[in-house]
């Protein structure tokens, strides 16, 4: 087992449980995205504190965390590509 801190486990589980409550459908994805802001800080704290090996382990152990991560990646790519517009005051 990969050693995770108690905080990493707790935060990964919080994000996992949030993302897992929505069905893996287009509507479920929309619901996930509507409330994702409240979980971004926990998500980022895990990402910033985990090694690549730890992140791989977290994504295997917490599929909801992985789903959340994939959506954050898609959003970031959409913003970078100019497909998603971000208001200038953000």
Indicate residue ranges for each PLM-predicted region:
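Residue-level detector of alpha-helix boundary/anchor positions
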Residues: 1-4, 43
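Acidic, low-complexity, intrinsically disordered interaction modules
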Residues: 24-80
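Short terminal alpha-helical segments
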Residues: 3-27
């Amino acid at each position: 087992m990969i050693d995770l801190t108690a905080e990493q486990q707790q935060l990964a589980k919080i994000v996992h449980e949030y993302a897992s409550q929505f069905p893996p459908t287009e509507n479920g994805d929309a619901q996930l995205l509507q409330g994702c802001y409240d979980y971004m800080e926990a998500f980022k704290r895990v990402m910033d504190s985990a090694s690549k090996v730890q992140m791989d382990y977290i994504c295997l152990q917490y599929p909801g965390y992985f789903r959340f991560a994939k959506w954050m990646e898609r959003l970031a790519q959409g913003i970078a590509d100019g497909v998603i517009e971000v208001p200038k005051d953000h």
